UniProtKB/Swiss-Prot annotation:
InterPro entries: ATP_synth_OSCP/delta_N_sf, ATPase_OSCP/dsu. It comes from Sulfurihydrogenibium sp. (strain YO3AOP1). GO terms for cellular component: plasma membrane; proton-transporting ATP synthase complex. The gene is atpH. Transmembrane segments: none annotated. It comes from the Bacteria. SUPFAM superfamilies: N-terminal domain of the delta subunit of the F1F0-ATP synthase (SSF47928). GO terms for molecular function: proton-transporting ATP synthase activity, rotational mechanism. Belongs to the ATPase delta chain family. F(1)F(0) ATP synthase produces ATP from ADP in the presence of a proton or sodium gradient. F-type ATPases consist of two structural domains, F(1) containing the extramembraneous catalytic core and F(0) containing the membrane proton channel, linked together by a central stalk and a peripheral stalk. During catalysis, ATP synthesis in the catalytic domain of F(1) is coupled via a rotary mechanism of the central stalk subunits to proton translocation. The keyword Cytoplasm does not apply. This is ATP synthase subunit delta. It is found in: Cell inner membrane. Its main location: membrane. It is a peripheral membrane protein.
Length: 182
């Protein structure tokens, strides 16, 4: 089933428009959308009910109301999420959280980043990398740090579309590629 991108943006923009734009509130909505995503992907009963064209709309609404009530979702956002089911677009629950996070990042001028290093990175080095990358791309970056011994040395830094690969592993691959041309 194909997902309608225009509908995605419309729903996300409506959610953002009808909510308090505090970081705390937007993070709460993001976590609710994460839970709906997980529920949609992992709970076959939930998925079958909201996607089944033969299930009554009343049953679908009751299910959504119970789930959203249990999650503590306010009335305005609940109406929007129930409208998704009424519009027969429930398949967007599996991706809605990603689009919402992207729009929230745009709203706050932040970018998710990742540092994959061959060794443990201390806080001072992380802050130094963060300040350099933020000055390069002009946005605030929230990094997740991972260790990967297969890099041998160095690191791979990703922030939005900005990628720096200084790992020994990639250097050796480039060297191998260059030498194999001769």
């Amino acid at each position: 089933m194909k997902i309608d991108k225009k509908y995605f943006r419309k729903v996300v923009n409506e959610i953002i428009a009808k909510t308090d734009k505090s970081e705390e509130n937007l993070l709460k909505i993001s976590s609710i959308l994460d839970i709906l995503n997980k529920l949609f992907k992992e709970n076959q009963t939930f998925r079958n009910i909201v996607l089944n064209p033969k299930a009554s709309m009343e049953d679908k609404e009751k299910l959504m109301e119970k789930v959203l009530s249990a999650l503590g979702v306010d009335a305005e956002i609940s109406k929007l999420l129930i409208k998704i089911v009424k519009d027969k677009k429930a398949n967007i629950f599996k991706e809605l959280n990603k689009v919402f996070k992207f729009e929230v990042e745009k709203f706050f001028g932040t970018v998710q980043g990742e540092i994959i290093s061959a060794y443990k990175i201390d806080e001072a080095l992380l802050n130094e990398i963060k300040s350099v990358i933020e000055s390069k791309i002009g946005k605030k970056v929230e990094f997740t740090v991972k260790e990967d011994n297969s890099l041998i040395g160095g690191a791979v830094i990703k922030a939005g579309t900005y990628i720096i690969d200084t790992s020994v592993k990639s250097y050796l691959k480039r060297l191998e590629s260059t030498l194999s041309r001769f």
